[in-house]
Amino acid sequence: MAESAAGALVESLVHLELNERSWPRSYDLMQIAAPDQIEIETLNVPVGDDWKRLPIMTRGLGDEWLNSKRTALARVPSAILPNTWNVLLNPEHLAGGQIRVIETTRADYDPRLFQKFGV
């Protein structure tokens, strides 16, 4: 999840494996709602030159948060876009079941996103 639609789009694009026959035509954008009493923890990722290249460090912070079950949601900085945040959901947290998808919108990818890659 991301705090913005643009952030979610970029995060999804970075994980796509593209070729001419398999590039996606559309995606589903979901709006998530959580009750006000559900705390969102901000994970203190050390931001420096190396943090994006050291996934073991950031994964360790995420694993520790997940296993601790302190909060149902955690806010983490995007490794792709500066000043952009992603939100992690801990499905094992007791309050996780209170978080709901309230709207889903199907949208077409703009073909210009893929033209420079020859797909």
Per-region residue spans from a language model:
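Active-site and NAD+-binding cores of ADP-ribose-processing enzymes
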Residues: 21-119
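Short helix-loop boundary/capping segments at the starts of domains
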Residues: 14-22
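Extended catalytic/binding region for NAD+/ADP-ribose chemistry, centered on the ART fold
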Residues: 1-15, 87-95
